[in-house]
Amino acid sequence: MNRLAGRVCLVTGSTGMAAAAAERFAGEGAAVFITSRTEGHCRALAERIAAAGGKVAFRAADLANEAEVELAVVDCVEAFGRIDSLFSVAGGSGRRFGDGPIHEVSGDAWDSTLRLNLRTQALVCGAVVRRMLAQEPNESGTRGSILLMGSVTATDPVPELFGTHAYAAAKGAITALMTAMAATYLPDRIRVNAVAPSLTRTPMAARAAGDEQILAFARSKQPLAGEMLDPDEVAQAAVYFLSDESRTVTGQLLKIDGGWSVNSVSPAPGRPL
C-alpha cells in the first residue's frame, strides 16, 4: 500500500484496464485524474474511487481534440497542483470503422483507427510533457513517469483471429513513440515506458469473450492467463512503472501476455478473419 502516496496520476480511459488502474492507483495513495470521452463512465469510476476513500477528479474530453486535451491537463493541475504520472490507456478496436487486412481497409478506416489509438496518445503525451517540463522534480529526482498502452498484436500477430492491420500499426507506432520520448526526455528526468497486454477481459474484448473458438485458442496461447488476462494484472504492472520502484527504468516495453509471445501455438487452419 501507499506505493504512489503523494503522487498525482492522470489516467486516460474510464473502463477496462483504465478503470482497474485508476482504482489501484488510488488504493496506493495517489490522487487520480480521469479523462475519457464518456462523461457517465468517468463519473461512475470517480464515484467508486471516492466511495473507497480515494482522491479523484475527472473531465470528459475527446482525446483526439487538441483543445480538449489541454483543458483536461489544466483541470488536473488545478485540482491537484501537478502531474507526476500518466497512464495513457484510451483507445479501442477499429473494426467498427472497417479495420481488417490491409487490402480491405479504406483510407477512412485507416485514419479513424489511428486517430483513436495513436493520435489520442500523442496529443495527451504532448500536453502532459509540456506540464512536466514546467514543474520541479519530485523527491525522487524525476519530473514524471509516462506509461503508454501497446499491444502484443503489434509484435506477435495472430492474423487468423485478429487481422486488424491499422490497429496493429497504431500499436507498433506507440512503441516507437515511447522509445523516442524516452531518449528525448531522459535529460529532463521524465521516464517513458509501455506495456503490451495480450487478450484481456475488457469491453473491447467483448467479441472475443463471446466466441468459443477464440477462447479455446486463448487458453492454449496464453496459458498463464487462462482465457483472458484480468485488467488488474495490467494495473499492477502500471503501479510499478509509475512508482519509484522503477525510477531507473525508461524506454522499455513490457509484454504482459501469459506466454503469448513465446508460444508457437496457432489457431486451427481455415478460420475466417
What are these regions (language model features)?
Residues 92-93, 137-173, 178-187, 199:
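Catalytic loop of short-chain dehydrogenase/reductase
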Residues 125-126, 179:
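A short, exposed helix-loop element centered on a Lys and neighboring polar residues
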Residues 250-273:
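Short C-terminal tail/terminal secondary-structure segment
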Residues 87, 186, 191, 249-251:
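Short, small/polar-rich loop/turn modules that mediate ligand/substrate recognition or access, typified
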Residues 2-33:
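Canonical Rossmann dinucleotide-binding motif of NAD(H)/NADP(H)-dependent dehydrogenases/reductases
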Residues 97-114, 218:
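Substrate-binding pocket helix/loop in short-chain dehydrogenase/reductase
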Residues 194, 213-249, 256-258:
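C-terminal helical subdomain
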